[in-house]
From Swiss-Prot:
Modified residues (Phosphothreonine): 439
Organism annotation: Arabidopsis thaliana (Mouse-ear cress)
Top EC class for this record: transferase
Location of Phosphotyrosine modifications: 350, 447
Name under which the protein is recorded: Protein kinase STUNTED
Subcellular location: Cytoplasm
Keyword ATP-binding listed: yes
Domain notes: The protein kinase domain is predicted to be catalytically inactive.
Amino acid sequence: MAVDKVIVKQRNIILVGIPIDESGVEVLKWALEEVAKHGDCVVVVHVCFTYYRALKSKSSLDRYLKPYIEFCSTKKIELKGEVLKGNSVLGVLVKEAKRYNAMSVVVGVKQQSKLSLKIAKGCAKELPSTTDILAIHRGNIVFRRSNHYQLPLAQKISSRPSSELSEGFSDKDLAKTTGQEKRKISGRSLSLPSVEVVDQTPGWPLLRTSTLATPMVQHQTRKISVVNWVMSLPERFPHHPNQTCQQSFCDKQLKDILKDINRWFSYDVLKTATSDFSLENLIGKGGCNEVYKGFLEDGKGVAVKILKPSVKEAVKEFVHEVSIVSSLSHSNISPLIGVCVHYNDLISVYNLSSKGSLEETLQGKHVLRWEERLKIAIGLGEALDYLHNQCSNPVIHRDVKSSNVLLSDEFEPQLSDFGLSMWGSKSCRYTIQRDVVGTFGYLAPEYFMYGKVSDKVDVYAFGVVLLELISGRTSISSDSPRGQESLVMWAKPMIEKGNAKELLDPNIAGTFDEDQFHKMVLAATHCLTRAATYRPNIKEILKLLRGEDDVSKWVKIEEDDEDGFDDEVYPNSNTELHLSLAMVDVEDNDSVSNSSLERSNNSLFSSSSSSSQELQS
C-alpha cells in the first residue's frame, strides 16, 4: 500500500500518531474501532528523526497497516500512512493536523505520567478547539480535549463512560483563555454566559454582587435561605450553538427518566398544599423557576419547585437533576419525594427541612454543641462516600457547602441540591469541564484554574465545611480584615503556626473534646491540600474523623508531603487583588452569602488564583 502524502478534502480526518511497535497497534486499532466512522479518512503518522530512518520505515509502515485494509474497506474508511522526518514528534503532529484540518488527533502513552502526556497536552495547546485530542493507554482514554459540547444528560444516557464523553481542553489553554463576561443576577445565583464587552478589568473574573432584580426578592432570599438549597441556577447550561435539540428529543428523555419515579403528585394536591401557589408561600425565585413551601394533607412540609421551561436548557436541567437524585438512596442525602408535570410546568417536590441549613444554624442564635458538629461532619462525609464510592455510577456533587446541608430535628445532616452534580468516572482520574460551576470559597484550585473535575473537588469543599463547623464562621466574610475574607486564608496562618485552638468557635470554648477537635482540624487541613493528587479521598478522611486511623500516621503524612503538584501548576497570585475584586459591590454582610456561579469557556480566566495560596499539606 502506498504511503505517499495525500491531502483528502471533504472528509473527516483522524490523525493517528504511532510508533511502529505493539503499542502502536493498540492505538491504531482503538482509533479505527472507537473514533473512525463511515466515510472518514484515517491518516497514520510515524515520525523519524533522520531521513535514513524515515526511508527505511516506509516499507515497514506498509506492512504494519496491511492487516487493517479489509476492516477499513468494510467500514468505508480510507486508511493512509505517512513516515515523516522531524526533530519533534509533537511539532510534526501539530503541523500535519493543521495541514489536514484534522477532526481528531489520537496518540498513545506508554505509562500514565506527566511526561507521557506531553504530546497530547502539547497538541491541545497548539491546535484549535475544533480538534478532538485523545491520549490512549491500554485501551483507555487518559486525556481528552473534546471538540464538542457534551451535556451531562448525554453522559448519563450513553453506554460509554462519562469520562470519555466529557469535554474540555488543556491546562494552559484554559489558563490563557480570554474573553469578557456578562453578569446576570437572580436570587443568590450568578450566571456568566460569554458575551463581548469592552474594558474588562483584569484579575478575578467571578465578581460577586448583592444587586437583585428587586429589593423585595432580595429580602425574601435572605430571609428564607433555609430552602435556598432547592433552588437551581437560572441557566445551568450556557448558550452554545451545538446545544440545540428537537423538543421531541427532550420529551423522550423526560419520559425515560420520569417513568421510574415512584411517586407522582397531582397538580391539584400541590396546588392545595401551597394555598394555590400564593405569594405568601413563595420562598424563592430563580431565572426560570419558583419555590413554594407547602404542607400536604398529612402535615408533611414540602418544598415545591416549579420549573417553567421557557428554554430547552431548562428541560435538560430538570431531566439531569431528577435522573441523578432519583438514583440515590442514603440517609444523609435529601431525597426527591416526587414529581409532577402539568402542561409546561415541570415540578419537583422535596422535604422541607425543619431545622434549616447548616449555614443558617451556624449563623443563627442556636449554638451547635461540639457533639452535634462532629455528628454533622461524619454524616456529610458518609453522604460523599456514598456518592463517590458506593453508587453504581459515581456522582460528583460540585456544590458542597454549608447552605446545601440540611439538618433534621436531631441534627442529622442531609446533602441537598444536585443541580450542579455530574456523573463521575471509575476509569479516569479526572475530566476536563468547559464550564466551572460551584460556589466561591469552596472551589478546589485544580477545578477553578483548569476545569479539572474529580471527586477530589468535593473533598476540598468538605474541608471548607469542616472549617465552618470548627470556627462557626462563613466561608466568605466581608467583615474580615483585608486578605482574610476567605475562611481558608484566615485559617491558614493559625494552622501553620500550630495555633489551631485559635480557630475554635468561642461559643463552644471549654465544652469540646480536644482529641476530636484536633482530628477535625487535621482532616480539614488534608482536605484542603492544594494538589488534588495528594489530597486524600473521602473514605480516608472519614476514618480520621471517626477515630479509626492513627493520628500519628496523618501527622507524618503532613510533615513528609512537599506540596506536590503532579501536572497541576498554580502560579503565584495576588490574593488581595483577587479578593478585593471578588468583593466588588458587596453592600453588607447578609449579601455575602455564598453565591453559586457558572462560567462558559470563553469567559475571562485569570492565570492566577487566590486558591493557589490556600491551605496545603
